[in-house]
From Swiss-Prot:
GO terms for cellular component: cytosol; nucleoplasm; nucleus. Belongs to the EXO5 family. This is Exonuclease V. GO terms for molecular function: 4 iron, 4 sulfur cluster binding; DNA binding; metal ion binding; single-stranded DNA 3'-5' DNA exonuclease activity; single-stranded DNA 5'-3' DNA exonuclease activity. Gene3D superfamilies: 3.90.320.10. Binds 1 [4Fe-4S] cluster. Changing residue 346 to A: Abolishes iron-sulfur-binding and affects exonuclease activity. One of its GO terms (biological process) is interstrand cross-link repair.
Length: 373
């Protein structure tokens, strides 16, 4: 009963979290895949006319003119970022920028990969508990469900030692980050281990560039989770970023779900108070071990595991660097020449100014950089 699915009346971004862990939002094809996917490489991108968020055609030139002095956070009306947004920046920052500017261009091949990966994640989650659908109609309801999940998962972890799909949220350089940890469990030695599942189309481990992205992702999960259990995340910060109305009454479906879980609440504020109290009193430890498990999609065979060494200074430095783009203090950057092979499977290769300019971003694409305060 720990995880839910929202009605279409509430967008995925309204909740702050996805239904499944965000580990499968983005899957990049290997270099070998690129060599076999000429149709994908040559597929026309949004180079001439694309559909905007209001479903009206927009030309690339008009899109470029829309880039002004607003920061990406302001321009895209973002209240927070997903962990995978920063993980994608680790792969190619410019791809992240194009994805926000021109959404909806995911190639069919990649969409199929995501569907398969999500199915495997769902099957794993169902091994531990059933799913309950709770209809919601407001962003407050959606966040209430996530708070309820946290309240239910914390005692389950302490009593049974194993949970999946744990929501996390916290600040990084003044920006709210949200995500969902795939799995948490205690080892035989009593250490808290984070396990992240990654599915592979081919029966082989990923290239180092992909591993680098994955390692940063799980490190960021630990960075946020540890801050939550150490009391470094505050209700005031969450309210400031999300603009949630704590006094708004919860919907009837959410209230029923709360009562079934043993919680007598009326508003989001009631739940938020319980969540932060639970994080404080549960005596949850910080995460001791970070593990990534790679499995083959077709056969479910484990291809290998990676134990990630958490380097807090390095994580902080990367977060600071990536947030500088989102806050408008610098231009988005493409990949280095040595990693230009990534462009072979990029949906935006045909319009990429970085690629066309051999690593120099066109002034028509780059927003005016704000000076860091």
């Amino acid at each position: 009963m720990a995880e839910t699915r929202e009605e279409e009346t509430v967008s995925a971004e309204a909740s702050g979290f996805s239904d499944l862990s965000d580990s499968e939002f983005l899957e990049f094809l290997d270099l070998e895949d690129a060599q076999e996917s000429k149709a994908l490489v040559n597929m026309p991108g949004p180079s001439s006319e694309s559909l905007g968020k209001d479903d009206k055609p927009i030309s690339l030139q008009n899109w470029k003119r829309g880039l002004d002095i607003l920061s990406p956070m302001e321009r895209f009306h973002l209240k927070y970022l997903y962990v995978t947004d920063l993980a994608t920046q680790n792969w190619c920052e410019l791809q992240t920028a194009y994805g926000k500017e021109l959404p909806g261009f995911l190639a069919p091949e990649k969409a199929a990969v995501l569907d398969t990966g999500a199915s495997i994640h769902l099957a794993r989650e169902l091994e531990l508990h059933d799913l309950v659908t709770v209809p919601v109609t407001t962003k407050e309801d959606a966040w209430a469900i996530k708070f309820l999940n946290i309240l239910l998962l914390i005692p389950t972890l302490q009593s049974e030692g194993h949970i999946r799909e744990f929501p996390v949220f916290g600040e990084g350089e003044g920006v709210l980050l949200v995500g969902v940890i795939d799995e948490l469990h205690y080892t035989a030695k009593g250490e808290l281990e984070l396990a992240e599942l990654k599915t592979r189309r081919r029966p082989m481990l990923p290239l180092e560039a992909q591993k680098k992205k994955d390692c940063f992702q799980v490190s960021l999960y630990k960075y946020i989770f540890d801050a939550m259990v150490q009391g470094k995340v505050t209700p005031a910060s969450l309210i400031h970023h999300t603009k949630l109305c704590l006094e708004k009454p919860l919907g009837p479906s959410v209230l029923r779900h709360a009562q079934q879980g043993g919680f007598s609440v009326k508003s989001l504020g009631d739940l938020m108070e319980l969540v932060f109290l639970s994080l404080t009193l549960s005596d949850l430890p910080v995460i001791d071990i970070l593990k990534i498990e790679y499995i083959h999609q077709e056969t479910a065979t484990v291809l290998g595991t990676e134990i990630v060494a958490f380097k807090e200074k390095e994580v902080r430095a990367k977060v600071q660097h990536y947030m500088a783009y989102w806050m408008g203090h610098r231009e988005p950057q493409g990949v280095d020449v040595e990693e230009a092979w990534k462009c072979r499977t990029c949906t935006y290769a045909d319009i990429c100014e970085w690629r066309k300019g051999s690593g120099v971003l066109s002034s028509t694409l780059a927003p005016q950089v704000k000076k860091a305060k």
